[in-house]
């Protein structure tokens, strides 16, 4: 205390945010944050990297909602001391954080590092022994959704012998995995991926009917349809929040669900089942090829992340950033000698052709095709259906609350929860990419004995942990398990729906990975190659939908933070880079949708169904509400307790404080141009104009 200060007066706690280990730095040629990205993302196709290199010299100011001096003083006085904030969500200051950013790149842009760094030794969990993890878990951390278990209980058994040609989804073309043609002999490829044995397990019409049912869902929270439906009212779409933010206006929710279906399931079904008459078997061939390409990319990206620092351009700060992120990432590839088919080259591009472009489109909606789901066995079919249903419902709920023409209607509690959801989705997607890379390597190299291959076939590991990973449960608990998260869930209808969607993806991925381990067999059970292949493809379907849902969340985060001026959205320090790595690896499976394109698609869908956004509330008699309280009951077992107390997400950082990183990594050129035009007062291309009267 200063000698001039009167006795008894305490100095006000500083609200200046703390520093973060990673932050923005103006980029140059191989310098700073972009230098690190070059080391990870370099490859034959540099189009995405070139988009990342676009940087404005000066950051545009964030357009914030106006507030008077009294409101500013009140907000400053209510800010908690930094020491009382949750350690994993601390906010870094731009200046302090910038001093810790790094520069550097690897010497050879074409060579994949093939040294034996320690990160590539060990099993599925890297240097951590899976048996040691099982000893620490003590019990199962896999808690499937009660709604999923109820749906699974009423699902009838498979009846492949009774499915006729007219019920099996149409003609079947010869299956193939294009990326492996000429590299793997036909008999070996058919043994690894017996696509010719993937006959429909149920009739397509039966699966179509079941997708339209949703046990336990009350009126207003509709299940996935199989075609566009006319339950929503046309005309004005009201975005004002109800007096009780724990509920939705039923009319607006129905309109949001209609928009969600037009940009996801209806889009993919229109392009495949109706226009081109593509068969589900063709979709499965694409999926198998995409998963193999994804496995190659996952191996390459993981190898570069763990590459030893070498070359004069890599300084101590660059090596430190690489070490920090490498210690957190789930991408821990096995040695090149164990997987020669994955490590033979660099990153691979997506499959060419119009069919592949369609399968990768529509926000990852291939699992909304009943004919594709009918090719899966019972548990995986229900898991894919349930994940599709809940992410569809969450997309509809987001579109009922977020719109470029009604940003001021978004509540702070809704914006704050979005970053937590994105954190979990990024970790879950990263772990799934790693799992697919390992299991594909195991399928293609059946005579190689590697600890990672043994781990992914270890049933007890996947029975104890979702995706067999302590990082997944750690991220879930860190983002969604603290007191603040539970309060956000209980006090917002949108947050409850988003939490249920994350839980559904957790349940689906935990189910298919456990079923894969069972299909691998052991000394007491026969190995089932066809069942194992079905489970790999089911994981690919769920991952594709997860990525589409994550892009939807990113679009809403950018809208709230950059267009609405909200400071509430926070993400883990490494979430943008983690998700960007995932998007790079999954290009063969999923064509990402930038925020600008997402909102352009939403606007086109709204015009198609004649919806006009307004910042008002509906009047009687259409002002009824829908309460998602049933989802809060479903969420009671989630998230499970973590295995350890360490942080998976890293320190929390406000999205507005890492604007250039977020923009370069996740928004793309079009989104950056839209933001630049918007903050300068011009209409933001891709973000929509003023609402129509």
UniProtKB/Swiss-Prot annotation:
Residues 63-75 have a biased composition (Basic residues). Belongs to the alphaherpesvirinae HHV-1 UL47 family. The nuclear export signal is CRM1-dependent. Residues 50-75 are annotated as: RNA-binding. Expressed in late in the infection. It comes from Human herpesvirus 1 (strain F). GO terms for biological process: regulation of DNA-templated transcription. Phosphorylated by US3. This phosphorylation is required for proper nuclear localization. GO terms for cellular component: host cell cytoplasm; host cell nucleus; viral tegument. Keywords: Host cytoplasm, Host nucleus, Late protein, RNA-binding, Transcription, Transcription regulation, Virion, Virion tegument. A motif (Nuclear export signal) lies at residues 647-670. InterPro entries: Herpes_UL47 (IPR005029). It is found in: Virion tegument; Host nucleus; Host cytoplasm. The keyword Transcription regulation applies. Interacts with US3 kinase. Interacts with UL31 and UL34; these interactions seem important for efficient virion nuclear egress. Interacts with UL41/VHS. Its main location: virion. This is Tegument protein UL47. Residues 48-57 have a biased composition (Acidic residues). One of its GO terms (molecular function) is RNA binding. A motif (Nuclear localization signal) lies at residues 63-75. Residues 1-32, 48-126 are annotated as: Disordered. Tegument protein that can bind to various RNA transcripts. Plays a role in the attenuation of selective viral and cellular mRNA degradation by modulating the activity of host shutoff RNase UL41/VHS. Also plays a role in the primary envelopment of virions in the perinuclear space, probably by interacting with two nuclear egress proteins UL31 and UL34.
């Amino acid at each position: 205390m200063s000698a001039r200060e009167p006795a008894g007066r305490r100095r006000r706690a500083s609200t200046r945010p703390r520093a973060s280990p990673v932050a923005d730095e103006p980029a140059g040629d191989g310098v700073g944050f972009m230098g690190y990205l070059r080391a990870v993302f370099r490859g034959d196709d540099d189009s995405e990297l070139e988009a990342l290199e676009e940087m404005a010299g000066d950051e545009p100011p964030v357009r914030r909602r106006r507030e008077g001096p009294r409101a500013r003083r009140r907000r400053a006085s209510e800010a908690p001391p930094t020491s009382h904030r949750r350690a994993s969500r601390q906010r870094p200051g731009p200046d302090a954080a910038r001093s810790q950013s790094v520069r550097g790149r690897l010497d050879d842009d074409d060579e994949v590092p093939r040294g034996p760094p320690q990160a590539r030794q060990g099993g599925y969990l890297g240097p951590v022994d899976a048996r040691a993890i099982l000893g620490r878990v003590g019990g199962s951390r896999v808690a499937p959704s009660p709604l999923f278990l109820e749906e699974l209980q009423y699902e009838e058994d498979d009846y492949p012998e009774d499915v006729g040609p007219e019920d099996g989804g149409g003609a079947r073309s010869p299956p193939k995995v294009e990326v492996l043609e000429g590299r793997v002999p036909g008999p070996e490829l058919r043994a690894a991926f017996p696509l010719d044995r993937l006959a429909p397990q149920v009739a397509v019409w039966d699966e179509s009917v079941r997708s339209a049912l949703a046990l336990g869902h009350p009126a207003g929270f509709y299940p996935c349809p199989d075609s566009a439906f006319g339950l929503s009212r046309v005309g004005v779409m009201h975005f004002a929040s109800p007096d009780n933010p724990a509920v939705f206006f039923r009319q607006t929710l129905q309109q949001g669900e209609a928009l969600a279906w037009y940009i996801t399931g209806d889009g993919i079904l229109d392009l495949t089942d109706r226009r081109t008459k593509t068969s589900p078997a063709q979709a499965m061939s694409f999926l198998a090829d995409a998963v193999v390409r994804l496995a190659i990319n996952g191996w390459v990206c993981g190898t570069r992340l763990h590459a030893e620092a070498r070359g004069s351009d890599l300084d101590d700060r660059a090596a430190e950033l690489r070490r920090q992120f490498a210690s957190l990432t789930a991408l821990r590839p096995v040695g090149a000698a164990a997987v020669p088919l994955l490590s033979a080259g660099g990153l691979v591009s997506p499959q060419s052709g119009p069919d592949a472009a369609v399968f990768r489109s529509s926000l990852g909606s291939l699992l909304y095709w009943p004919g594709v789901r009918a090719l899966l066995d019972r548990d995986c079919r229900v898991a894919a259906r349930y994940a599709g249903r809940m992410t569809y419902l969450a997309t509809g709920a987001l579109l009922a609350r977020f719109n470029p023409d009604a940003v001021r209607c978004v509540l702070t509690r809704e914006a704050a929860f979005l970053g937590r959801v994105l954190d979990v989705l990024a970790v879950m997607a990263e772990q799934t990419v790693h799992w697919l890379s390992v299991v594909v390597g195991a399928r293609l190299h059946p005579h190689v004995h590697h600890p990672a291959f043994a781990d992914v076939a270890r049933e007890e590991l996947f029975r104890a942990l979702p995706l067999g990973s302590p990082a997944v449960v750690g991220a879930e608990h860190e983002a969604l398990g603290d007191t603040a998260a539970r309060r956000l869930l209980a006090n917002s209808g949108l947050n409850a729906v988003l939490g249920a969607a994350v839980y559904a993806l957790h349940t689906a991925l935990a189910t298919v990975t456990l079923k894969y381990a069972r299909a691998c067999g052991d000394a007491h059970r026969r190995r089932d190659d066809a069942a194992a292949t079905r489970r790999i493809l089911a994981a690919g379907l769920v991952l594709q939908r997860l990525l589409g849902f994550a892009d939807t969340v990113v679009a809403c985060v950018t809208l709230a933070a950059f267009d609405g001026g909200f400071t509430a959205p926070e993400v883990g320090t490494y979430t943008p880079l983690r998700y960007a790595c995932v998007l790079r690896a999954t290009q063969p499976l999923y064509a990402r949708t930038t925020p600008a394109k997402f909102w352009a698609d939403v606007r086109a869908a709204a015009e198609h169904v004649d919806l006009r956004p307004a910042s008002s509330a509906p009047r009687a008699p259409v002002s009824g509400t829908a309460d998602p309280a049933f989802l809060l009951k479903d969420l009671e077992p989630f998230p499970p307790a973590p295995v350890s107390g360490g942080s998976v997400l890293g320190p929390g950082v406000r999205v507005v404080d890492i604007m250039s990183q977020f923009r370069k990594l996740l928004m793309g050129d079009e989104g950056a141009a839209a933001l630049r035009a918007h903050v300068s007062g011009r209409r933001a291309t891709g973000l929509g104009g003023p609402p129509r009267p």
